[in-house]
């Protein structure tokens, strides 16, 4: 038993030694890892074996994959990549075919569009030439019309003179026939038809009163200018360049983009010189000098000059009635600035009075109260459109003498009337005594005739200019002779020009004082508290006249979803016939409604039904948010501004005392922005019962579900008149002063 055990131990030790040491086979390289050598019987089955075990270092000898398995894996991967490459090649081929197809379609499209684009370009050029030629012909026609109108006027004057001559001849014949009675062989009973001549004269007067100078004669035609649109200033390396194939197919190299500009020339206006500013369009400039001779006698005195003109307008109208033509005469007498000229009533016609002197300006109101506003230290220059001659006035104070610049003297040598009167010994009672001076004024008498439109214009002018530096204690009696007789007669067209260029404070002032104020149209006004002259549309045909258009919507051509500054300044425009869309501007509306003002809202739906609403309104300042004060509703449209929308509650929809809101300045009472949601600036509450500045929807009814981005009734609405989903066709807002009603 023991030997067997010893034998087993020795055998184990031998095996362990053999395991630790390398054999000769391994030393010769036979121990390297590699594919197992398989018998022929296993070659056919290795391709189909799928569940190969995982090979690790410990199991390399029994589980290592054979070369057959590795070759299969390589073949599968190669086949996969080959399929991918074939797929990519197929997609490239398809894209190339599509590219060729798209190029062919582009070429066909270009060939179709190119003739049309070239034809359109030619039409644009022809349109520019035709419009230029048309404008030239219109200007020629206007000149011919003006020539024909002058010929018609000359013929009217000739016919009138012939009628007068015929009447005179008939009267002479009647006198001779009457003188022949008793001494002639025959006698005739001849009577002059005086009534017939009077009717002819009235008809001629009525014909001459027709205005044959239409409005377009006084306006300058706009000029249509077409010029090529300049290319952008972007550098070339930032621009996308087409491929060489597409460059050959470019059809727009010869097509030029044209910019069409309609230039409207600015209308000339008469500038009024004030202070140290230089006058424009003037024929005479009157300046003043300030000197102090003696501090003890004439301290705080100065001399200034001003021109005050009063115009008397006599309008004759011939009205045909059942009893025959009858004549109406309307006489007005106002100054160019709208002040009272009643103190000049009863003056002698054909004279111009020049008053000169120095002293405290406030003392002049004893003689001429209206002149106080003219004698100010800040206003030392005035302008006049008359063509005036020149004269020199001499002034003597004490032992010295001085000569001041040129004054003005009207000369009418063709009338044969010219005289000079010396008023040096006169001193108005309003000046204090203390220093002596001598002044010389020129009184020029004139007479001429001017008739336009059947109306005769007579002018009375009060001109004051500096003729002495001091006016002191010249002793004279205090009788009525100290005040000269203010009488003048003038038919010069300058008076008419002054009236035509009159800038009123509102349309009601224009209606009363402007020559063409009785007609609706574009006029220039200067609101109280503003130095800016506005061009506004005045409606003189609606009840009482004097309505100033501040808002209008009629075709949706103007976007009313504007900023606060846009609504402050105003936007849009209307033509001379009142066509167009505009917002006059919150600042201008505030200036025009500082006093109680009547607001008239006119509405029209798409069926032609009209309604109106009138209120008494005031609009606050910008610091107050242009708050709307509104009351006293009258009309047929329903009270939307004060009462609001009764179904939603007046406290939420009334616009009274509300501030103006725009999408960039939210001043409403809603937690969100009403102006942003409803698409326009307005006096929102929470939010509205009326909004005349909303989105303009043609056709009337609209579905708010399709409104983007807010599905809400945001049209031009006046809910008491039409439903909230009905957008009105025409809306207008007009104002006029309440005090003139």
From Swiss-Prot:
Residues 1-18 form the signal peptide. Keywords: Blood coagulation, Calcium, Coiled coil, Disulfide bond, Hemostasis, Metal-binding, Pyrrolidone carboxylic acid, Secreted, Signal. It comes from Gallus gallus (Chicken). One of its GO terms (biological process) is positive regulation of heterotypic cell-cell adhesion. Disulfide bonds join 310-341, 674-687. InterPro entries: FIB_ANG-like (IPR037579), Fibrinogen-like_C (IPR036056), Fibrinogen_a/b/g_C_1 (IPR014716), Fibrinogen_a/b/g_C_dom (IPR002181), Fibrinogen_a/b/g_coil_dom (IPR012290), Fibrinogen_aC (IPR021996), Fibrinogen_CS (IPR020837). This is Fibrinogen alpha chain. Residues 277-288, 450-459 have a biased composition (Polar residues).
């Amino acid at each position: 038993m023991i030997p067997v055990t010893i034998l087993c131990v020795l055998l184990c030790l031998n095996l362990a030694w053999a395991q630790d040491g390398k054999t000769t086979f391994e030393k010769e390289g036979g121990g390297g890892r590699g594919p197992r050598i398989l018998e022929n019987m296993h070659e056919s089955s290795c391709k189909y074996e799928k569940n190969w075990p995982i090979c690790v270092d410990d199991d390399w000898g029994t589980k290592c994959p054979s070369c057959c398995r590795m070759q299969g894996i390589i073949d599968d991967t190669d086949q996969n990549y080959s399929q991918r490459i074939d797929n990519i090649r197929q997609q490239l081929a398809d894209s190339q075919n599509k590219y060729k197809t798209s190029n062919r379609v582009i070429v066909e499209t270009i060939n179709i569009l190119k003739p049309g684009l070239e034809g359109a370009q030619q039409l644009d050029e022809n349109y520019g030439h035709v419009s230029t030629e048309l404008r030239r012909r219109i200007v020629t026609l206007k000149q011919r019309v003006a020539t024909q109108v002058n010929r018609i006027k000359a013929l009217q004057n000739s016919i009138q003179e012939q009628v007068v001559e015929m009447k005179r001849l008939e009267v002479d014949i009647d006198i001779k026939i009457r003188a022949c009675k008793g001494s002639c062989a025959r006698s005739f009973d001849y009577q002059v038809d005086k009534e017939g001549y009077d009717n002819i004269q009235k008809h001629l007067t009525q014909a001459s009163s027709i205005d044959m100078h239409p409005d377009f004669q006084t306006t300058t035609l706009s000029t249509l200018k077409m010029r090529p649109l300049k290319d952008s200033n972007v550098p070339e390396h930032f621009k996308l360049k087409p491929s060489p194939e597409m460059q050959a197919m470019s059809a727009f190299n010869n097509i030029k983009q044209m910019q069409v500009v309609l230039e409207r020339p600015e209308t000339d206006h008469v500038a009024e010189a004030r202070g140290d500013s230089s006058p424009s369009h003037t024929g005479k400039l009157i300046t003043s000098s300030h000197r102090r001779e003696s501090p003890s006698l004439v301290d705080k005195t100065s001399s200034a000059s001003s021109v005050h003109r009063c115009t008397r307008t006599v309008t004759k109208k011939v009205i045909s009635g059942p009893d025959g033509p009858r004549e109406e005469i309307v006489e007005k007498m106002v100054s160019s600035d709208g002040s009272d000229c009643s103190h000049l009533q009863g003056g002698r016609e054909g004279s111009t009075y020049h008053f000169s002197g120095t002293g405290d300006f406030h003392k002049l109101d004893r003689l001429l109260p209206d002149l106080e506003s003219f004698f100010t230290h800040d206003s030392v220059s005035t302008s006049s459109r008359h063509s005036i001659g020149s004269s020199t006035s001499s002034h003597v104070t004490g032992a010295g003498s001085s000569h001041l610049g040129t004054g003005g003297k009207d000369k009418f040598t063709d009338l044969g009337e010219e005289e000079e009167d010396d008023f040096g010994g006169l001193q108005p009672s309003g000046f204090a005594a203390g220093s002596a001076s001598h002044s010389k004024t020129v009184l020029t008498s004139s007479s001429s005739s001017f008739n336009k439109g059947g109306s005769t214009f007579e002018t009375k002018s009060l001109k004051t200019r500096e003729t002495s530096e001091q006016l002191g204690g010249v002793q004279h009696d205090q009788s009525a002779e100290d005040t000269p007789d203010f009488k003048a007669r003038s038919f010069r067209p300058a008076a008419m020009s002054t009236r035509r260029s009159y800038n009123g404070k509102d349309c009601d002032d224009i209606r009363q004082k402007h020559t063409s104020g009785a007609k609706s149209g574009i006029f220039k006004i200067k609101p109280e508290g503003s130095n800016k002259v506005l061009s506004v549309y005045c409606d003189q045909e609606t009840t009482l006249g004097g309505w100033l258009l501040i808002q209008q919507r009629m075709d949706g051509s103007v976007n009313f979803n504007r900023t606060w500054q846009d609504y402050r300044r105003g936007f849009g425009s209307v033509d001379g016939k009142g066509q167009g869309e505009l917002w006059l501007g919150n600042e201008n509306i505030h200036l025009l409604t500082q006093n109680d003002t009547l607001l008239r809202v006119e509405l029209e739906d798409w069926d032609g039904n009209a309604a109106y609403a009138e209120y008494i309104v005031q609009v606050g300042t910008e610091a107050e948010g242009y708050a709307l004060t509104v009351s006293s509703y009258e009309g047929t449209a329903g009270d939307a501004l004060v009462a609001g929308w009764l179904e939603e509650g007046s406290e939420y929809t009334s616009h009274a005392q509300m501030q103006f809101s725009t999408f960039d300045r939210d001043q409403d009472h809603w937690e969100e922005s009403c102006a942003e949601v409803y698409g326009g600036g307005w006096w929102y509450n929470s939010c509205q019962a009326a909004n005349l500045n909303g989105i303009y929807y043609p056709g009337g009814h609209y579905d708010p579900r399709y409104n983007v981005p807010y599905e809400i009734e945001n049209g031009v609405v006046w809910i008491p008149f039409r439903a909230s989903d009905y957008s009105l066709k025409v809306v207008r807002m007009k104002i006029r002063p309440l005090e003139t009603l």
